[in-house]
C-alpha cells in the first residue's frame, strides 16, 4: 500500500518541479507591449526619434535586404536618412492589424502593417515582425524584421 502512495507522491513532485517557476500575467504583458508600440508611433509622429526607438534593446538586430544590422545606431541612421527631414517626420506613421502573442513566459512576437501617409507623398506600407524579450528593465524589442 505504501509503494503506490509513495509513487504517486514522487510523480506529483516531479510534475510540480517540471512546471514553470513563475506564472506570468500574459494580459498585463501584452498590454505593456501594445502600450510601448503605440507610444513609439506617437513619438515618431511628433519628431521624437529617440522616443520612437525606445522600444528597442541596445543589442537589437534589424533585418535589412543586406542582412541583419546590430544595435540601435544603424536603425536610427536609416530612419533619419529615409523618414525625417530637419528633425521632423516626412510622413505620419500608423500601425494596423497589430497582433501580439506569447512565445513563452519571457518572449513575445508582435506583427502589424505599418503605413506612412501624408506629407504630399505617396502612401507607403509594409509589414513588420518584432521579437520581444522580457529584460530586467522590462519588455524590449530584440529583433525587427520590416518589409
Residue map of PLM features:
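Short, low-complexity N-terminal intrinsically disordered segments enriched in polar/charged residues
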Residues: 18-58, 74
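A short gly/proline-enriched turn/hairpin at secondary-structure junctions
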Residues: 59-70, 84-89
